[in-house]
Amino acid sequence: VVKKFGRSSKLLALLLSLTLVFVAGCQAIANVDFNTVLNKALKVTSTEGKQSIELKMLFDEQAFVGLPEEEMALMKLVSSLKLQLDNVKVQDSSNLSLNGSLIFGDATSIKFSLKMSDTLAVMELEGAKQPFVLDLTSESLLGLTGIPVFPVADEETAAKPALDEASMTALGHQIVDTVGAYAINNLPNPERIQVKPAIEPINGISTSLTHVHIDLDGPEIWTWLKKYVDALVADRAGLDKMVAGVFEILAGNPELWAAMGTVNPFTEGELDAPTPEEMVKEASDAIAVMLTELQAELKLVETEDKETLDEVLSKDLTIKADVYIDNKLDIRKQVYELSYVPSANPELAVLPLKGLTVKVESEAWNVNGAVKAEVPVATESAIHAEQLFTMQGYKILKQFDEKSTIYDLLKNKLHIGKQSVSWFTDDEYNPPIVTPVGVTIIPLRDTAEQLGAVITYDKKTKGIKVFDEATNTTIVVKIGSDKAVVNGKTVKWSFPVTVVDGAAYVPARNIASALGAKISWTEFYEDVKIFKIEREV
């Protein structure tokens, strides 16, 4: 089942993205040059518009019988999702701004706005007490990933030429044109396609457009894919020309390699280095072999796994595409809808779904015109994204109004305030210990810090102090004593604080009670058990 799920999910993931290719790769119909349409679409640098993505899932409720009520409610919540983006302004590849909303079902929604430049992104969320900012400089982004940032080694490296945005864009356009001559021109027409004139509102203005409509089902997609691969394999001359063209572009722009800090493979000098002609032939041969292997793999699927193929790419899988093109061959409006009914065969079913629909819509105006996006500004009160990565769930909740929709979603639906700490009985470092009198003791520092509490040691009083911000609880204990002071009140615990291998251990049930948590034991395997302390704050 896992193997089939992997194959099925990969096929499904390609379907929607292929639809535009179906449209753009067609041979000219009704005097519309679709190859030019795609090339222009790939070269759009500025635009205004609006977009939406909608997902609807019809679950088989029988598959969820016995699930907790909270999980059922969450499944229903995500069964209908819509991301709506309005007032989208794309100034260039680095600067944009938009307003949007994430809609759950028919009523629940969270509004937001986003402003981005080449160095900064600022998002405001409805219900948030302050905006969230993300530093987009390379050093900051590397820091988020945990990759160390090293200083520039020498002046030579620091002086490395950088390609400006205009140069990179021009290079990209050249490569699109070169690759498109082979990859796009070999695209076959889908079987069902219609082209007719239409008048559609774009930004509220009635606009004369050419309407391209395509219908596809699973078997038609498979037929189209085989025809496309066959055409690519047959056009060896086109492949050779494409590869030679790409290599010519790369060889003619040595500053690209310098900007990347990579050795230019086209630089002459080494005696045994391959010639440019040899490199082109080697690359072209490798792609040709890959395409031939793909062609054989498609045939193999038809013979050895036809049942899965017929179930996944069945007539119950449909794609409808409506693309509206103006007289400049710019795409102004797009509507794509994918519908899928999973297999009724339990061995082939990948999810407990009765049906799935994905709908994508967009409108565009002022295409490649003068567009000015709103400029992001980081205020002093803004929360930086890197802070969120280290925040406990309860601290994240404090960034939102308790009466807001997003607070309710995070706390009561997604339960980000849930915390748990687990130990295996065979852990080599600070395992849970069951004492001879039957009391379970656990390491105090590990417990406190993983729950977000702060632990300190007072050398003068020799007291260990734990402050738990989530519950506003203060606990003071001493080594060797079974007395604890919880929020100023002295209580007796079931076992004295004990040092084991340098770590202070405390009775689990007592510390859990003081911190508003519960404890539990579960079997893992053979003689190994898992001890867990958990709470929701």
Question: What are the residue ranges of the model-derived segments?
Answer:
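C-terminal motif of bacterial Sec signal peptides marking the signal peptidase cleavage site
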Residues: 22-25
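Bacterial N-terminal signal peptides that target proteins for export
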Residues: 2-12
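Subset-of-secretome marker
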Residues: 27-439, 444-449, 453-476, 497-498, ...
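Extracytoplasmic/periplasmic beta-strand context in beta-sandwich domains
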Residues: 526-528
